[in-house]
Amino acid sequence: MSKRCTFIALSNQKGGVGKSTMTVLLASYFHYVKGKNVAVIDCDYPQFSIQALRSRDMKNVERSESLQQLLCRQYERTGKKAYPVLTSGPGKVLETADRLSGNSDILFFDLPGTVNTPGILEAIINMDYVFTPVVQDRMVMQSSLSFVATLRDFIRQYPEAPLKEILLFWNKIDGRVSREVYRHYNEIFEKIGLKTLSTVMPDLSLIHISEPTRPY
């Protein structure tokens, strides 16, 4: 296939680490804030979480005049319509990407976590970057490291593959946990040759957002 844009995948074989949420956040940031032409390919069969979220949002907009007004204001401010979200079976990821790459600056892929799924490893080595969210949980950590190790072993067989880097990043950071814990994990990652982003994402479920009816 002829790749004419940047391919970025978020992938981890452990569920609940925020993979789909981060895909949406990154796509929205680059599309609406940075002005890039972005598309998302939801490959996480069978749940297709991002496509389900988009369908729910569209129904909410259809039922709400205030949301319609907000959408119009956003378009007036940014000149950007909603970015496309397509679903794809694991074996047709690159075929779907080929249809979108000519009109996009960045394609984001929400990949399934099972690397044994046919076509997934081939898709991963054709990415430019793979971001793997990790959380401070022993079982999740073991699963994440096993996942990355499998990818690295496979990539070594294809030295000419487009994939540049696999990068880990901390998600759902619990502010109550000592930073020494995260520093210790980062040292382990570094010793085994894994790169970790310095930017971390907090656990928003621990942040109480004040509401007009809620006392401080």
What residues fall within each predicted segment?
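Walker A (P-loop) phosphate-binding motif
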Residues: S2-Y32
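Single conserved hydrophobic/aromatic residue that forms the stacking wall/gate
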Residues: I207-Y216
